[in-house]
């Protein structure tokens, strides 16, 4: 059997190695149009920022190492330009010599990846405007920075790549501005959770231009000027485009393969395309969203590696099936960690799903053990079925662990309230006896059992201030004086039983505290005394971050007690 693979990196390279492990006699040829067969594309921004200092560390495999270990023929700087599906041949061009020839195949695997979105804007062809997708792109940006000693940079786009590049340029000493068309960075987060990202970046000195649309670029002496829709201008030494990526489908389109969402290559769960003996994996393909089962495109390295393995199994006569992607992802933003999986609340509601969410601010480990830090978790679930829909976490330590547990629970089909039953590892340096994931489950179970009703940050402005409801802040007097929401009266939770006569039991009571715990306790006290209570999801800390985009303290206090 002769297998030709178009494209290396995650999907193609993992498939090639798997095929060899399954079939020692197969002839395997990999064509890669860049100069690198398998590289750490997720690490490219960190080479720009000199976090990774050795360019060789970006290379995971070389043509020589692939041949020596796997006897796989890898040809870099070779582009496949045409597929003849009838004759089962591909046309190959050596990009260094210009030589072209045809190569036959029994099985063909496409792993072309994605290409950076580069809108047709005036001035976009300037040599001072860069995209980051390949190792060669990385070297060009790095060399430009070293050569020009650039001081100011504009990053267009506020997704993962844009933020990582902005961070690394800032760490390198540049003044950085991020321009983003929507009103928030990171569309994998809800606006409320993205507010923590905004606060962190601003605290680190990065300028954010949200709700800003780029209309053109202009060369002005040694500067490149970015022009925005509101007629403002930003002068800089360089511009990095990180607007997003689109499936690289030119070869698939030429071959007549069926295309789907955003021009992606349609495959079944065996990674087979619409043409027999042609498979496809990675950022170029259409996948099923694991939560919604709808067709989508999810360009991440983890899914690409799994897809490569599944395609290899089936090429070699197996019967492996891809179960879909949830989009589990994580990013470091200076000393902050941000992670998410599944659907955001905004996306779920836009799809007509009747959903609810809980927001909590647990500690990374036991509060009495030194170094515990607060994380903010948001868990989204369907109201009627209690199905887990998604989760988002912002914090420092322990974020990755909790996100992975939540993603695993979603994959296993657990209901949201069942999170309380998970038996998770505990010792004071690592967690609490009630792990944050368990705590989310407890909160959801309380809602399910009718023990508490919630209200959210975007409802506060609409609450009446005419005396028809009671707005109650149950924090300490010190906390209340340090900052509170207009219209809220202060009765600390520990004084509530003695001062309950100050609250009119004929009016609904909307309760808030710092994180949501004391206000929940207050709601239970009041509810059992005949009051109609609503607990604020997330607490004042969360509200202040969302409304004021204020960077809140990352430290917690012993035993979960708040100052």
Model-derived regions, located:
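A Rossmann-like FAD-binding core segment of flavoenzymes
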Residues: 25-27, 69, 75-96, 103, ...
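Rossmann-like dinucleotide-binding cores of NAD(P)H-dependent redox enzymes
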Residues: 59, 152, 160-218, 298-304, ...
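Short hydrophobic core segments
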Residues: 103-113, 156, 234-244, 308, ...
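FAD-site-proximal beta/loop scaffold in flavoenzymes
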Residues: 125-149, 221, 233-310, 405, ...
């Amino acid at each position: 059997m002769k297998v030709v693979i178009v494209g290396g990196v995650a999907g193609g390279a993992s498939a090639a190695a798997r095929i060899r492990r399954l079939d020692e006699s197969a002839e395997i040829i990999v064509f890669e149009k860049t100069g690198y067969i398998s590289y750490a594309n997720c690490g490219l921004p960190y080479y720009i920022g000199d976090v990774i200092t050795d360019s060789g560390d970006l290379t995971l495999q070389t043509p020589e190492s692939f041949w020596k270990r796997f006897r796989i023929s890898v040809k870099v700087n070779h582009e496949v330009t045409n597929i003849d599906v009838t004759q089962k041949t591909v046309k190959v061009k050596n990009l260094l010599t210009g030589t072209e020839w045809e190569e036959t195949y029994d099985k063909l695997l496409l792993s072309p990846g994605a290409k950076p979105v580069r809108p047709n804007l005036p001035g976009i062809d300037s040599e001072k405007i860069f995209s980051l997708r390949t190792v060669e792109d990385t070297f060009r940006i790095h060399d430009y920075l070293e050569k020009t000693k650039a001081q100011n940079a504009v990053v267009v786009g506020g997704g993962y790549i844009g933020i990582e590049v902005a961070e690394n340029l800032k760490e390198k000493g540049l003044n950085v501005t991020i321009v983003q068309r929507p009103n928030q960075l990171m569309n994998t987060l809800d606006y409320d959770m993205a507010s923590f990202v905004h606060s962190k970046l601003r605290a680190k000195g990065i300028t954010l231009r949200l709700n800003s649309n780029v209309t053109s670029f202009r060369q002005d002496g040694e500067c490149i000027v970015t022009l925005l829709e509101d007629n403002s201008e930003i002068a800089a030494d360089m511009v990095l485009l990180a607007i997003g990526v689109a499936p690289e489908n030119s070869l698939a389109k030429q071959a007549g393969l069926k295309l789907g969402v955003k021009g992606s290559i349609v495959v079944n769960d065996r990674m087979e395309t619409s043409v027999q003996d042609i498979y496809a994996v990675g950022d170029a393909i259409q996948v099923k969203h694991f939560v919604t089962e709808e067709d989508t495109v999810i360009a991440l390295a983890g899914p690409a590696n799994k897809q490569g393995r599944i395609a290899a199994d089936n090429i070699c006569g197996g019967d492996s099936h891809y179960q879909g992607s949830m989009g589990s992802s994580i990013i470091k933003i200076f000393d902050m960690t941000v992670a998410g999986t599944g659907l955001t609340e905004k996306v779920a509601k836009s799809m007509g799903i009747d959903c609810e969410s809980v927001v909590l601010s647990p500690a990374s480990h036991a509060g009495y053990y030194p170094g515990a830090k607060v994380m903010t978790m948001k868990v989204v679930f369907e109201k009627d079925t209690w199905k887990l829909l998604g989760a988002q976490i912002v914090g420092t330590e322990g974020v990755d662990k909790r996100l992975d547990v939540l993603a695993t629970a979603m994959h296993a089909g657990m209901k949201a309230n069942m999170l309380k039953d998970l038996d998770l590892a505990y010792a004071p340096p690592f967690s609490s006896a009630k792990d944050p994931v368990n705590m989310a489950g407890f909160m959801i179970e309380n809602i399910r059992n009718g023990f508490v009703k919630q209200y959210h940050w975007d409802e506060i402005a609409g609450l009446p201030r005419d005396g028809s409801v009671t707005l109650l802040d149950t924090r300490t007097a010190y906390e209340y004086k340090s900052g509170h929401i207009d219209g809220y009266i202060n009765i600390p939770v520990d004084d509530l039983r003695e001062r309950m006569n100050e609250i009119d039991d004929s009016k609904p009571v909307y309760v808030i505290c710092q994180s949501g715990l004391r206000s929940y306790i207050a709601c239970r006290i009041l509810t059992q005394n005949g009051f109609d209570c609503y607990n604020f999801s997330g607490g004042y800390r969360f509200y202040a971050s969302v409304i004021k985009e204020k960077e809140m303290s990352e430290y917690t206090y012993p035993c979960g007690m708040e100052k």
